[in-house]
Amino acid sequence: MSSALMPVRTHIVIPARLKSTRLPNKPLLTIHGKPMILWVAEKAQLADFADDMCIATDDESVAKVCAEAGFDVVMTRSDHASGTDRLAEVAAIKGWAAHDIVVNMQGDEPLIPPLLLEQVKTLLVQDAESVMATLCEPIEDYNTFIHPSVVKVVSQNTNNQQRAIYFSRAPIPCDRDVVLSDEDNTQAPKNAYRHLGLYAYRVSLLQQFVHWSQTPLEILESLEQLRVLENGGHIAIAKAACPLPAGVDTQEDLDRLNAMSLTAFQDD
């Protein structure tokens, strides 16, 4: 059967690494008594558009916890340059077809709405010329706009498809008149958008990605998606259909989630 006639399958992959610099052992830290990675995996199970899901880790302790909870686990190498390189290894191990789609679900976002997972997958399906898809949300606060930990994205409409032009930790786009004025800035430009680290990939891209060397801008900005743009790939992008609750990067974030009602983690 030709690939054009074969069904496109969608796979959710949740990368889980213990070596977080700001919050060690993050996947196994508990929220209301349950390891965070299990909260995330249970969210993935609610995404009924997906054919399957798995957890990708390089740590035996994470693998043990997830396997004992009944989840599919893929052991990966520990020396990947980026999360996308890790996904490529998973796709190769699983033998997924080149035309399949992989949704990368962050392992530190236990409150992510499954709606956003489906949105990013649908976005890629609808843009046949793009090899990746991702989401963004408007930035209003100026301090958020200029903070280097907040990744900004600028995009353009091409053939009725919105596609990313560039991602940066710098405040882009720059309003020249505001920058040159002596007034204190309190608001970001009207067309400032924050990139949300949620991706859908074609497996064919993952197969190419691992053969590309890290690119100058990718290394400079420490943003793996720039490797795709620098190699001529298109990345579809859209404004998130609903807010994405903050994930867990610090102990304060973890404390905040533990202080929330248990019902906040349960979907109707």
From Swiss-Prot:
The gene is kdsB. It comes from the Bacteria. The lineage of its organism: Bacteria, Pseudomonadati, Pseudomonadota, Gammaproteobacteria, Moraxellales. One of its GO terms (cellular component) is cytosol. This is 3-deoxy-manno-octulosonate cytidylyltransferase. Its EC number is 2.7.7.38. One of its GO terms (biological process) is CMP-keto-3-deoxy-D-manno-octulosonic acid biosynthetic process. It is found in: Cytoplasm. Pfam families: CTP_transf_3. Keywords: Cytoplasm, Lipopolysaccharide biosynthesis, Nucleotidyltransferase, Transferase. It catalyses: 3-deoxy-alpha-D-manno-oct-2-ulosonate + CTP = CMP-3-deoxy-beta-D-manno-octulosonate + diphosphate. InterPro entries: Cytidylyl_trans, KdsB, Nucleotide-diphossugar_trans. Belongs to the KdsB family. One of its GO terms (molecular function) is 3-deoxy-manno-octulosonate cytidylyltransferase activity. Pathway: Nucleotide-sugar biosynthesis; CMP-3-deoxy-D-manno-octulosonate biosynthesis; CMP-3-deoxy-D-manno-octulosonate from 3-deoxy-D-manno-octulosonate and CTP: step 1/1; Bacterial outer membrane biogenesis; lipopolysaccharide biosynthesis. SUPFAM superfamilies: Nucleotide-diphospho-sugar transferases. Activates KDO (a required 8-carbon sugar) for incorporation into bacterial lipopolysaccharide in Gram-negative bacteria.
